[in-house]
């Protein structure tokens, strides 16, 4: 056992006596009532994600803890949270008008809703696994939103890795040419890294190292497939109580092909400013590389170390000022690569700033961690390591193992031919339908044989949900509790072929961080869950995490008021720099 693994064990033993509140990270089931604890998120209003925060039930004790459980040690790693509790008796009708108990999924409650859809926590009755089901409403009202959904479900099908959120199933629509909504089933994650950072001021160096390792391992896989995520930030990294992380929200991701024009590749780039690489703050460099994601990883790592965003810029110019305040004035070589003349002139005329030693900026932090952080935050992208190179840094000695770091093959250009042409609504509908069939192999074979079936001979899951839960909606509207109507003589939905999943058990065993199952037991096909349904899906992205139960506006701190926003495109940014700082 390595030194860092031993230190985790000592930490666990030291905290053995600390008890965990009953309203922790777990889902507590008593009879028909389900009580779920939810985080208070920092709402990202400026990003316009469209989610309404649902406030139900009393506010929980802010000193309660989330239990990060190690089965080997039999102890808890306490992580503070400030949850709110949703009243389990109030099941929102918005979801159940379209969705309810079909043969496979037992819905427990609605856990999120917004302009783009509704999310429910459910149990897969075949496996006992807890899942999150997102119903995305009116997918094709806007072709741009539908294209983003198509891109994301395609990438999440092609990128299968333990550090990337997984789509488990997509329900077959009732009609090939007329469907409007889609139902996507995800593995259920409990929270996101933003909430973990915000709720904890006592994360250990082992946490920092473990989190960064998983993030870089995921990016190694993603970049090997020639994919750039383009929107990495703590809210787009899901987290579980066993300290496992998973990257989500691939709605802005792009596959890089050698013949992809830079102007086309970055036309719609609007990633969150605080985590945006300097070359994206003013169309700096003629060719973008995976180094844009590496910069974001560095910003996230710094936030893990300090508990605060590293570069919380109020606008693009302020963002550049914060970067140069820490990293110093860029070198002449770096400035020469800036293609926007006015942006280049602004930085060239900037007063000379010395580089701040990272030991001063981050006092008390492991020197090896700071050395790697400096590499990740190099101003010039050519000076940043690749994810694969970063994993060989001495900081990960005794932890990194290439056998646990699979890489993907580059994605075929044929998968993303749709990016090169203007799509009509019916085009996107057909492409999304084709992606859905990947989870219904029997129907896919018929489709590939040239079948032109417009509707299906057996009831689709969506049809059954509408029919079976009409009574539940009526009961909820009257303030009554209602149980889902049991299915009678409906055929089972087509099952997707189950592939092997990448395992990570050996790695967790080495770190003495045990795998915590998503359920304790299965009785009559329904699990008795241990975990809270915290991974909510926001906005037009189908996989991003969004917790509900927001703090009252007057209670938000100054940091929360500086919410990062989805910003201008690169060209607009250049013009803004020119106007403000000519």
UniProtKB/Swiss-Prot annotation:
Family statement: Belongs to the protein kinase superfamily. CMGC Ser/Thr protein kinase family. MAP kinase subfamily.
Biased composition (Basic and acidic residues): 33-45, 493-502
Induction: By ethylene and infection with rice blast fungus (M.grisea).
Biased composition (Acidic residues): 557-572
Binding site for ATP: 111-119, 134
Residues recorded with modification Phosphotyrosine: 269
Location of the Protein kinase domain: 105-396
Gene3D superfamilies, alphabetized: Phosphorylase Kinase, domain 1, Transferase(Phosphotransferase) domain 1
Sequence motif TXY, residues: 267-269
Catalysed reactions, as listed in the record: L-seryl-[protein] + ATP = O-phospho-L-seryl-[protein] + ADP + H(+); L-threonyl-[protein] + ATP = O-phospho-L-threonyl-[protein] + ADP + H(+)
Protein name, UniProt field: Mitogen-activated protein kinase 17
Annotated catalytic residues: 231
InterPro entries linked: Kinase-like_dom_sf, MAP_kinase, MAP_kinase_CS, Prot_kinase_dom, Protein_kinase_ATP_BS
Keywords linked to the UniProt accession: ATP-binding, Kinase, Nucleotide-binding, Phosphoprotein, Serine/threonine-protein kinase, Transferase
Posttranslational modification: Dually phosphorylated on Thr-267 and Tyr-269, which activates the enzyme.
């Amino acid at each position: 056992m390595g030194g860092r693994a031993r230190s985790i064990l000592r930490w666990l033993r030291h905290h053995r006596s600390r008890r965990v509140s009953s309203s922790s990270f777990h889902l507590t089931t008593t009879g028909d009532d389900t009580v779920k604890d939810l985080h208070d998120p920092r709402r990202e209003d400026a990003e316009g994600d469209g989610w309404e925060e649902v406030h139900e039930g009393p506010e929980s004790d802010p000193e309660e803890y989330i239990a990060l459980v190690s089965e080997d040690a039999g102890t808890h790693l306490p992580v503070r949270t400030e949850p709110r509790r949703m009243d389990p008796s109030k099941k929102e009708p918005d979801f159940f008008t379209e969705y309810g108990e079909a043969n496979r999924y037992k819905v427990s409650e609605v856990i999120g809703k917004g302009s783009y859809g509704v999310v429910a926590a459910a149990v897969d009755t075949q496996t006992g696994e807890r899942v999150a089901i997102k119903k995305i409403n009116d997918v094709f009202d806007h072709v741009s939103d539908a294209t983003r959904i198509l891109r994301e479900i395609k990438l999440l099908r092609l990128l299968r890795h333990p550090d990337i959120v997984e789509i488990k199933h997509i329900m077959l629509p009732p009609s090939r040419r007329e469907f409007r909504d889609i139902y996507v089933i995800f593995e259920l994650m409990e929270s996101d890294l933003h909430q973990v950072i915000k709720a904890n001021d006592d994360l250990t160096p082992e946490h920092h190292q473990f989190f960064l390792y998983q993030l870089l391992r995921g990016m190694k896989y993603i970049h090997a497939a020639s994919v750039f995520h383009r929107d990495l930030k703590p809210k787009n990294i899901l987290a579980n109580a066993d300290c496992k992380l998973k990257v989500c929200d691939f709605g802005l991701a792009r596959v890089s092909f050698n013949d992809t024009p830079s102007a086309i590749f970055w036309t719609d780039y609007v990633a969150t400013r605080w985590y945006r690489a300097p070359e994206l703050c003013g169309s700096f460099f003629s060719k973008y590389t995976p180094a844009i994601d590496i910069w974001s990883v560095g910003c996230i790592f710094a936030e893990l170390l300090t508990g605060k965003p590293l570069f919380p810029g109020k606008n693009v110019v302020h963002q550049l000022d914060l970067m140069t305040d820490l990293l110093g004035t860029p070198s002449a070589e770096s400035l020469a690569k800036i293609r926007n003349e006015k942006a280049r002139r602004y930085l060239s005329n900037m007063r000379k700033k010395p580089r701040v030693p990272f030991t001063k900026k981050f006092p008390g932090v492991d020197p090896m961690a700071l050395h790697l952080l400096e590499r990740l935050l190099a101003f010039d992208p050519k000076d940043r390591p690749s994810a694969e190179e970063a994993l060989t840094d001495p900081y990960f000695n005794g932890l990194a193992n290439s056998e646990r770091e699979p890489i993907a093959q580059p994605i075929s250009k044929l998968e993303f031919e749709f990016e090169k042409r203007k799509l009509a609504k019916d085009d996107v509908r057909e492409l999304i339908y084709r992606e859905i069939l990947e989870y219904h192999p029997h129907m896919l074979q018929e489709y590939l044989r040239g079948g032109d079936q417009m509707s299906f001979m057996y009831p689709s899951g969506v049809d059954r949900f509408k029919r079976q839960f009409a009574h539940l909606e009526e009961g909820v509207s009257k303030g009554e509790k209602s149980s889902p109507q049991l299915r009678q003589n409906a055929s089972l939905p087509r099952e997707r072929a189950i592939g092997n999943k990448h395992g990570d058990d050996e790695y967790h065993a080495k770190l003495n961080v045990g795998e915590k199952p998503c359920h304790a037991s299965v009785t009559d096909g329904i699990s008795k869950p241990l975990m809270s349904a915290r991974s909510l899906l926001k906005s037009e992205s189908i996989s991003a995490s969004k917790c509900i139960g927001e703090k009252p506006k007057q209670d938000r701190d100054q940091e929360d008021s500086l919410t990062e926003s989805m910003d201008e495109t690169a060209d607009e940014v250049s013009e803004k720099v020119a106007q403000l700082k000519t």
